[in-house]
From Swiss-Prot:
The lineage of its organism: Bacteria, Pseudomonadati, Aquificota, Aquificia, Aquificales. SUPFAM superfamilies: Isocitrate/Isopropylmalate dehydrogenase-like. Binds 1 Mg(2+) or Mn(2+) ion per subunit. Catalyzes the oxidative decarboxylation of isocitrate to 2-oxoglutarate and carbon dioxide with the concomitant reduction of NADP(+). The keyword Oxidoreductase applies. This is Isocitrate dehydrogenase [NADP].
């Protein structure tokens, strides 16, 4: 793929090229950001369609920043390697250099990264989350004008906060028939009083850790977001009626956070009360009920706080309501450190064809602009995407969605779509 030439984009050449013109974002003692007018922001193209959608994102975000600030602010983009390209160039799928520059940069963005199946290779996405303690996966879901499978898609405007470090994703598993599984089974039966009928000899076991500390920091982030953005109805979900020690505890800890001095008087927990000015309402909802409510009345919820596994389910269902993950941005956020990303996979079947939908990564780029305080530029991106979709212009998947609903649409390639959006940035 031929790369578009950007004077403020520094591609990897034997090592990361750090521009002298740029400055690194700084993390203050209170974990807020000190953002210069010329921040260095690293990007990872990713695998599959990653390079194509990254080029599109760079064009759109650069255009929005230039149109908004007329040169007084500029991002200096630095390419880092991870995934297939990193393995090809360095022999490692996640080079130490990438981790070092991400640490110094505080904020970054990446395309999709694959994990080879059956080769014993650990997920790079998981490794990055662990390295920088990105403990909240934040996924806004809203309609931009695309064809959708549900009527009145404007009803969908919510943000899923998925806890990113706890739960069954901890990866502590014991496969059926192994000595380890046998040892754990015997311990549970003999020492912990577990019933033998629940743990037959051929049982496999996965551990589901959930801690008070990790839960509460995640809930605080979600409640702060809701209060700062005037999001009134907040749900904390889980199967606490079944898994009392984990998901039940998660819900209880969420309500304890609501009673902390920071939130006292700002978070309404009475089921019969309505939130007033400057308040939000926190409601407990069983996970299966939430899945049903998202389909039947998505407008009921503004923010959903979830555990890792339930958040995985809920965020994908919510995305499906507005056309799928190709329209949804995402940010992995910790205490200051943040890595924004596309929500979809590598899509190797269309890689290199120049037809991939770049909106997920582009909207993640706009989300990143908001995160560093450049909200005016972010809004220009959102407005331009809406204008472009309102004219029924998009990559083949977007155009096909319109056509299936009897709407005439214009199908364009990835970069042409990015150019159409950029032309509409005002």
């Amino acid at each position: 793929m031929n790369k578009t030439t950007f004077e403020n984009v520094y591609y990897w050449e034997g090592k990361a090229q750090i521009p002298q013109e740029g400055q690194f974002i700084k993390l203050k003692e209170d974990k807020t950001l000190e953002v210069p007018d010329n921040p260095i922001i690293p990007f990872i193209e990713g695998d599959g369609i990653g390079p194509e959608i990254t080029q599109a994102m760079l064009l759109i975000i650069n255009t929005a920043v230039e149109k908004t600030y007329n040169g007084s602010k500029k991002i200096y983009w630095v390419e880092l390697l991870a995934g297939d390209k990193a393995e090809e160039k360095t022999g490692e799928r996640l080079p130490q250099e990438t981790l070092d520059v991400l640490k110094e940069s505080i904020v970054g963005i990446k395309g999709p990264l694959g994990t080879p199946v059956g080769k014993g290779v650990r997920s790079i996405n998981s490794a990055l989350r662990r390295a920088f303690d990105y403990y909240s996966a934040v996924r806004p879901v809203y309609w931009m004008g695309q064809a959708t499978p549900i009527p009145n898609p404007e009803r969908v405007d919510l943000v899923v906060f998925r806890e990113n470090t706890d739960d069954v994703y901890a990866g502590v598993e014991f496969f059926a028939g192994t000595p380890e599984a046998k040892k754990v089974r015997e311990f549970l039966i003999k020492e912990m009083g577990a019933k033998e009928e629940g743990f037959p000899e051929d049982v496999g076991i996965t551990v589901k850790p959930m801690s008070e500390f990790k839960t509460k920091r995640h809930v605080r982030k979600a409640l702060r977001y809701a209060l700062e953005n005037n999001k009134k109805n907040v749900a904390v979900i889980g199967k606490g009626n079944i898994m009392k020690a984990t998901e039940g505890a998660f819900i209880n800890w969420a309500f304890e956070v609501a009673e902390e001095p920071e939130f006292k008087g700002k978070v309404v927990t009475d089921p019969e009360a309505e939130p007033g000015e400057g308040q939000v309402k926190l409601t407990k909802v069983i996970t299966d009920q939430m899945l049903m409510q998202l389909v039947l009345k998505p407008e009921a919820w503004d923010v959903i706080i979830a555990q890792n596994l339930n958040g995985d389910y809920v965020s994908d269902l919510a995305a499906s309501l507005i056309g799928g993950p190709g329209f949804v941005p995402s940010g992995n956020i910790g205490d200051g450190y943040a890595l924004f990303e596309s929500t979809h996979g590598t899509a190797w079947d269309i890689a290199g064809k120049g037809i991939a939908n770049p909106l997920s990564l582009t909207l993640s780029g706009a989300m990143m602009l908001e995160y560093i305080g450049w909200k005016e530029a972010a809004q220009k991106v959102y407005d331009a995407v809406r204008r472009t979709l309102a004219e029924h212009i998009g990559t083949p998947d977007i155009a096909s969605g319109f056509q299936k609903q009897g709407i005439e649409a214009k199908a364009v390639g990835t970069m042409e779509f990015a150019e159409e959006i950029s032309k509409r940035i005002e």
